Design a protein with these regions (language model features):
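Secretory/extracellular carbohydrate-interaction modules
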Residues: 129-213
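N-terminal secretory signal peptides
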Residues: 1-13, 24-28
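Flexible glycan-contacting loops in extracellular carbohydrate-active proteins
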Residues: 266-293
Length: 315
């Protein structure tokens, strides 16, 4: 794919327009876009300074953000302008000299790359990545979580861009293929999962927890807390917001909003509800995904704006 022509002849396309066009073509998309002049970053909507500048010649590194002043400090990670951020190779070989580590993120499966400070899964495949994710990404199974685990009553917001889901020999097509948000991540076996775009067009809120009477490191089981039908369009940007708060009166409350509309709103009062702080993150299955503007901050647990829930929303 060739990069989109610059509007007006000399003006470079915005990074959002360029990445949108690039992600929309699978294997060659971003490779083609990289042949173009690097676009200037768009001014962020909140008026703050844009993210990291071009990566140094010896490889990309994340811009150093000030250490948070304390628990529940807002989380606004800054990605490098280009290149690999971290991957499952670094997770499984933390002491390897060629492992790429991130101060903010852990990837337990797949690869996290950056393009003009956007996060990107790369083109998903079913093979394990090497130290630089040069030949394979492994991102048909993409698991991204924060190093921080102090997110209690929290609202997570970001913009996401997803291509239609595919399949690999390792990962055949499943109804749940798509994009998911994690809240109160305690481990790979204990978390809240908010599915914002699944292959089957559903949005679903689940709690994952260790199987009763089984070892804690054994694959956990899911309990569905809420579900509705709300299929976001592929190949375009969408704003997602997930919140978790409580317990209050013995209940943990979780909501999912898409493009400003509440689509799931549920209370978890099961004895296995997750009441303590944890990490936040993103999960992808058989899906190429990009994201930007990822933030996590305090959430009071108040009712969302008076917008009608999606049809079939579980309260």
């Amino acid at each position: 794919m060739t990069a989109p022509s610059a509007p007006g002849g000399n003006r470079a396309p915005s990074r959002r327009a360029l990445l949108t066009a690039a992600v929309a073509t699978p294997a060659a998309g971003l490779a083609g876009a990289l042949a173009a002049d690097r676009p200037d970053p768009d001014p962020p909507a909140d008026g703050k300074a844009p993210g990291a500048g071009p990566a140094p010649a010896d490889g990309p590194t994340e811009t150093e953000s000030p250490d948070p002043p304390g628990d529940q400090a807002p989380f606004r990670p800054v990605l490098p302008s280009d290149g690999l951020v971290t991957n499952e190779y670094a997770f499984s070989r933390p002491d390897a000299d060629d492992a790429r580590h991130s101060r903010d993120w852990v990837v337990t499966s797949g690869s996290l790359l950056a393009r003009w400070t956007f996060g990107w899964t790369g083109v998903p495949d079913g093979e394990p990545p090497g130290p630089g994710s040069a030949l394979h990404t492994g991102s048909s199974v993409f698991r991204l979580v924060t190093r921080r685990r102090d997110f209690g009553d929290t609202a997570v917001r970001c913009w996401v861009y997803l291509r239609p889901p595919g399949a690999t020999d390792r990962t055949p097509a499943r109804d749940w293929d798509g994009g998911h948000l994690w809240l109160r991540y305690h481990s790979a076996q204990e978390l809240y999962a908010l599915s914002f775009r699944r292959r089957d067009g559903k949005v679903v809120l689940k709690r994952k927890h260790p199987a009763p009477g089984r070892p804690a490191d054994e694959e956990g089981v899911y309990t569905t807390l809420a579900t509705a039908r709300h299929a976001l369009g592929h190949d375009r940007w969408h704003q997602i917001c997930g919140t978790v708060s409580g317990p209050r009166d013995g209940r943990v409350r979780i909501t999912l909003s898409l493009n400003g509309r509440t689509v799931l709103d549920a209370e978890d009062e099961d004895p296995g509800r997750l009441v303590t702080a944890g990490g936040v993150g993103l999960r992808g299955d058989n899906t190429e995904m990009a994201f930007f503007g990822f933030t996590a901050g305090n959430h009071t647990g108040g009712r969302p704006r008076a917008e009608p829930p999606a049809e079939g929303t579980s309260r």
